[in-house]
Amino acid sequence: MASSNRHWPSMFKSKPHPHQWQHDINSPLLPSASHRSSPFSSGCEVERSPEPKPRWNPKPEQIRILEAIFNSGMVNPPREEIRRIRAQLQEYGQVGDANVFYWFQNRKSRSKHKLRLLHNHSKHSLPQTQPQPQPQPSASSSSSSSSSSSKSTKPRKSKNKNNTNLSLGGSQMMGMFPPEPAFLFPVSTVGGFEGITVSSQLGFLSGDMIEQQKPAPTCTGLLLSEIMNGSVSYGTHHQQHLSEKEVEEMRMKMLQQPQTQICYATTNHQIASYNNNNNNNNIMLHIPPTTSTATTITTSHSLATVPSTSDQLQVQADARIRVFINEMELEVSSGPFNVRDAFGEEVVLINSAGQPIVTDEYGVALHPLQHGASYYLI
């Protein structure tokens, strides 16, 4: 059908009906009805440019009729149908067959152009809309990674919690400690003062002494009176329990003496073991060798025990001095100081001049520490 309508302007000149051709000639809007110069006209009239044709502006009623016919599927109406459409449009204004024909041609080109624009727009919008569902797997992957990271961090937290568990009289004491594993020396005074009294916590990290922050008052710590309620065992040591009467007596004694609150931070296999004897009040400190993922703490394989012989340090409460070890203030006995019992076998204590403190075979310093002096552990 499109090929038959290719040469429409020539078909209008064929004059199939004399009345129709006469009507087209009389129409001022047809291209053939332009002002022609007659052969008998003068030369000045021939030189005159033809007047411009007025453009056909269809009325709203005519546009509605044409749109209804075009939307019904008649994109290229045949010649007979064009005449019928023109007769229908003439009820609302003057119109020619060529006007109807060209309106359908323009309407078809406009629809094609509109479809082309929609197709291009959809083609450009597809790459933008397709990546939008992609963040979902990334979100799922991020959620899975976050869940996996949370899973990976949960065991660490549980490890820290397990590390800070202390079995005291058959119950577990949970402490709030820094995440770094540290070896802390507690204050130890029962009856007569024995060993050393640490006014602040002392920690080893990678062989260096660093100061641990004191826990807040709300920290779940162990008072010395609670430590003396029973022995905190390491490994398979049997726990010993005291009677309620002895416990109350211990608490009354410890409440009379001003003491600081102590928190114990332990590693996987490191725990302090205290054995309370009613006779000599010895304090036994079991320090097995440990290896942590964050730090490596090397201690002696042998049991660091306060000797119960003449080498045992028994210092009265009024015979104590204060020294600075690794910039930390400590209160120690004024007599010979046992370095091995306090810090382990492999630790060497040096003074501010860099000279090591000479000790005997039991780890006791040959010369007492000087009051107010500074010492360092290596």
From Swiss-Prot:
One GO term of the cellular component aspect? Answer: cytoplasm
The record's subcellular location field reads: Nucleus; Cytoplasm
Q: Which SMART domains match?
A: HOX
User: Which residue ranges hold the DNA-binding region?
Assistant: 51-115
Give the keywords, sorted. Answer: Cytoplasm, Developmental protein, DNA-binding, Homeobox, Nucleus, Transcription, Transcription regulation
Bias (Basic and acidic residues): 45-54
Q: Which tissues does the record link to its expression?
A: Expressed in the basal cell and later at the boundary between suspensor and proembryo. Expressed at low levels in proliferating tissues post embryonically. Detected in vegetative shoot apical meristem, leaf primordia, floral meristems, emerging floral organs, epidermal layer of the placenta and in the upper portion of the root meristematic zone.
Q: What induces it?
A: Up-regulated in the zygote after fertilization by the transcription factor WRKY2.
Q: What happens when the gene is disrupted?
A: Embryonic lethality when homozygous. Reduction in embryonic growth, failure in axillary shoot apical meristem and leaf-primordia initiation and growth, and failure in primary root growth and lateral root initiation when heterozygous. Wox8 and wox9 double mutants are embryo lethal, with embryos disrupted as early as the first cell division in the embryo proper.
Q: Which GO terms describe its biological process?
A: embryo development ending in seed dormancy; positive regulation of cell population proliferation; regulation of meristem growth
Bias-annotated ranges (Low complexity) = 32-42, 137-152, 161-171
Kindly list the GO molecular function terms attached to this UniProt entry: DNA-binding transcription factor activity; transcription cis-regulatory region binding
Spans annotated as Disordered: 1-60, 123-173
Family stated for the protein in its record: Belongs to the WUS homeobox family.
Its biological purpose is as follows: Homeodomain transcription factor required for meristem growth and early development. Promotes cell proliferation and prevents premature differentiation in meristematic tissues during postembryonic development. Essential for maintaining tissue growth during embryogenesis. May act by repressing TSS to promote meristematic proliferation. Involved in the transcriptional activation of a subset of cytokinin response factors. May act as a negative regulator of cytokinin signaling in the dark.
Report further notes: The seedling growth arrest phenotype of the stip mutants likely resulted from a G2 cell cycle arrest of the meristematic tissue. Exogenous sucrose in the growth medium reactivate the stip meristems by repressing TSS and activating the expression of cell cycle regulators, and thus promoting G2 to M transition in meristematic tissues.
Q: What protein name does the entry list?
A: WUSCHEL-related homeobox 9
- Which species expresses this protein natively? Arabidopsis thaliana (Mouse-ear cress)
